[in-house]
Amino acid sequence: ACATHPPMTKSRKVLVTGGAGYIGSHAVLALKDAGHLPVVVDILTTGFGWAVPDDVPFYEGDISDGDLVARIFHEQGVEAIMHFAGSIIVPESVENPLKYYRNNTANSRSLIESAVTAGVKHFIFSSTAATYGLPEESPVREDTPQIPINPYGLSKLMTEYMLRDVAAVHDFNYCALRYFNVAGADPQGRTGQSTAGATHLIKVAVEAALGKRGHVGVFGTD
């Protein structure tokens, strides 16, 4: 889901939230390889400092800290945001929904407000296919109804709604990426899926094939 998001045709300073995590660290490398200038902010709850290249500015902190984010914008001249920070485990979101509404929804609201205040106009949001819930059609399309069935999906969908509404009234454009099963690693071995106990399907299947876990849990019949 995108709202008038232009291609980055010139080198830009891009703030990558969660840039020490799995997807975020790959985005940092992709930005560098494309000639852009990434800046990372990560609280290192699940990310790793070693995943951030030495030549990339790194701030350890929470995106809900408006003063920190404003300082990053000022010091680095940030022009765009790629927002990967958040919590992603579906069963945990059911057991602890408030954690997800804080980390994924409330913190995203703070980041969006900081961006609007600073005049940062370009925002790419790491959403999730969980916003679709149990879709009645396959393959799923971008305009398939979004009816999440767990707090994780809903916490991400609410952020999409915030971005939509902000873009309608401010000089602000965004794109929301709704992943299904993320897999893979940097071909040069610079980063990869390193989180202990990760729940990504492909990693779980590979670990089962290698004998590192006893089974792969299958949910649903498709």
Model-identified regions with their sequence ranges:
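N-terminal Rossmann NAD(P)H-binding glycine-rich loop of SDR-like oxidoreductase domains
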Residues: 15-34
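SDR active-site strand-loop-helix element
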Residues: 17, 41, 81-85, 123-128, ...
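Conserved glycine-rich Rossmann-like NAD(P)H-binding loop of the short-chain dehydrogenase/reductase
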Residues: 36-45
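Rossmann-fold cofactor-recognition segment
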Residues: 55-64
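NAD(P)H-binding glycine-rich loop region in Rossmannoid oxidoreductase-like domains
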Residues: 63-103
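Catalytic helix-loop patch of NAD(P)-dependent Rossmann-fold dehydrogenases
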Residues: 95-113, 117, 121-122, 131-176, ...
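Alpha-helical substrate-binding/gating segment
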Residues: 182-185, 203-222
